């Protein structure tokens, strides 16, 4: 693990800095920069007909202003007084026997970057306390609709603004500070180790689920207690399903003994910060001719797109470059027919590369602030989760792919207008490839990018790793 990352993470999560940034964003959006910001953490919720709690997932906006993973908590930021207050559950004698003593306010004050820690039960009293002096009382509270429990009251305030806070948080969360980048780096470090472990286990594995278990256990053993999303472990034709989740197919043909290629899209989560990495490689240790041809196209797509990345560049243009590289490669193989210009104009490559090139990443895998337009009439951009130009300290994924999904491609083949651009006889050799995707996580720098992802992707190297086991 990177010692520089460890040194950064030895400090507190910069919640106070984040609160100030959000206050500045509110002011920049036309508000007077006065008032109280209010956020709630996730509530404990019981499973139906059970005394077990459902798996807990902290609200990301709450964590951004607190650094706290405790359930049933609150945070307020008095903009005028520059005071950040965390409210955590008090000890419940009936629960101590089962779960031990909770974090005390004194311990929480040492752990978190806040000015004061109170009990969750004091939230209404403290909100009212802010308004006791009418001359200095904040007039407004900023909150998020449907994120305020029935027990909380804002009656002491003259006004409640339900519109501005979510947008301000989204704008701030797009741009990562050094601490957040260190968290994302650590998440990537752990996930790279897990991807490497899966590569080494691939040759002898019998079923997709075994390799999912290898990934999860490697992450957990290195401090990543959760996954950023459900791991995708897709062998052969399963790789044509973008978010395949079954992970339960045997890895060897019972008749021929052949082992297909594997696509693994998985990322551990470290202290709520994600990674999102995809690698593809042959389970036998040697790519088939067709699989290697597609792999080389996808790697070229990623390389050319990454060469374009720097502040001020439009993500739409980088995404379009990926399609142009895909068209060139598929023409070279004979899968496509026609001119590159006509194929691009007709959006034929969407049949083989239907998703967006990438997205913002942070506390959510598909992080906030991307401004997607799923109603875009242009099919090439409809599923692009990031629209706009890149800026320093944003974190993006770059994940081109080429897929052979019958559900998507066959309507093109049957179309009188579009079918002529695809050679079905050549295409038949590639259905078994399924899909290839290569995905890295990049921080935008002042003049380019920093690649956080270190998992091997050179085709000869991944073959060697699988062969050696």
UniProtKB/Swiss-Prot annotation:
GO MF entries: manganese ion binding; metalloaminopeptidase activity
Residues annotated to bind Mn(2+) 2: 265, 276, 439
Pfam family membership, one: Peptidase_M24
Alphabetically ordered keywords of this record: Aminopeptidase, Hydrolase, Manganese, Metal-binding, Metalloprotease, Protease
Catalytic reaction list: Release of any N-terminal amino acid, including proline, that is linked to proline, even from a dipeptide or tripeptide
Protein name according to UniProt: Probable Xaa-Pro aminopeptidase PEPP
SUPFAM superfamilies: Creatinase/aminopeptidase, Creatinase/prolidase N-terminal domain
NADP as UniProt keyword: no
Species per Swiss-Prot/TrEMBL record: Coccidioides posadasii (strain C735) (Valley fever fungus)
Transmembrane segments: none
Cofactor binding mode and count: Binds 2 manganese ions per subunit.
Protein family membership: Belongs to the peptidase M24B family.
EC number in record: 3.4.11.9
GO BP term, example: proteolysis
List of residues binding Mn(2+) 1: 276, 399, 439
Uppermost EC category: hydrolase
Gene that this polypeptide is encoded by: PEPP
Cofactor(s) of this protein: Mn(2+)
Function: Catalyzes the removal of a penultimate prolyl residue from the N-termini of peptides.
Extent of the signal sequence: none
């Amino acid at each position: 693990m990177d010692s520089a990352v460890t040194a950064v993470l030895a400090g507190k999560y910069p919640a106070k800095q984040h609160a100030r940034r959000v206050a500045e964003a509110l002011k920049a959006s036309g508000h007077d920069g006065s008032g109280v910001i209010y956020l709630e953490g996730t509530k404990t919720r019981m499973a139906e007909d059970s005394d077990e709690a459902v798996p807990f997932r902290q609200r990301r906006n709450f964590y951004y202003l607190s650094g706290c993973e405790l359930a049933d908590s609150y945070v307020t930021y008095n903009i005028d007084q520059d005071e950040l207050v965390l409210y955590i559950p008090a000890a419940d004698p009936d629960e101590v026997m089962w779960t031990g003593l909770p974090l005390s306010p004194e311990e929480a004050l040492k752990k978190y970057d806040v000015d004061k820690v109170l009990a969750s039960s004091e939230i209404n009293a403290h909100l009212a306390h802010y308004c006791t002096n009418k001359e200095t009382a904040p007039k407004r509270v900023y909150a998020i609709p449907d994120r305020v429990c029935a027990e909380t009251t804002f009656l002491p305030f003259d006004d409640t603004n339900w519109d501005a806070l979510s947008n301000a948080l989204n704008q701030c969360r797009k741009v990562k500070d050094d601490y957040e980048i260190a968290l994302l780096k650590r998440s990537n470090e752990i996930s790279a180790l897990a991807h490497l472990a899966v590569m080494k286990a691939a040759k002898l594995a019998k079923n997709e689920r075994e390799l999912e278990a290898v990934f999860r256990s490697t992450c957990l053993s290195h401090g990543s207690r959760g996954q950023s999303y459900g791991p995708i472990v897709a062998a052969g034709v399963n790789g044509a399903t973008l978010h395949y989740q079954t992970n339960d197919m045997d890895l060897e043909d019972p008749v021929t003994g052949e082992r297909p290629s594997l696509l693994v899209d998985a990322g551990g989560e470290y202290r709520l910060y994600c990674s999102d990495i995809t690698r593809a490689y042959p389970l036998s240790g040697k790519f088939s001719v067709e699989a290697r041809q597609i792999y080389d196209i996808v790697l070229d797509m990623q390389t050319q797109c990454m060469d374009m990345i720097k502040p001020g560049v439009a993500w739409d243009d980088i995404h379009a470059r990926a399609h142009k590289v895909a068209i060139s490669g598929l023409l070279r193989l004979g899968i496509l027919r026609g001119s590159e210009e006509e194929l691009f104009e007709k959006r034929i490559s969407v049949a083989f590369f239907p998703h967006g090139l990438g997205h913002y990443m942070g506390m959510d895998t598909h992080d906030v602030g991307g401004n997607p337009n799923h109603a875009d009439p242009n099919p090439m951009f409809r599923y692009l989760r990031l629209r706009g130009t890149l800026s320093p300290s944003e974190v993006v994924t770059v994940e081109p792919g080429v897929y052979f999904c019958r559900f998507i491609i066959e309507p093109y083949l049957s179309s009188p207008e579009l079918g002529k651009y695809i050679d079905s006889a050549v295409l038949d050799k590639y259905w078994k490839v399924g899909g290839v995707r290569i995905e890295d996580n990049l921080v935008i720098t002042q003049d380019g990018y920093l690649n956080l992802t270190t998992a091997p992707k050179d085709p000869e190297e991944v073959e060697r790793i699988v062969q050696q086991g």
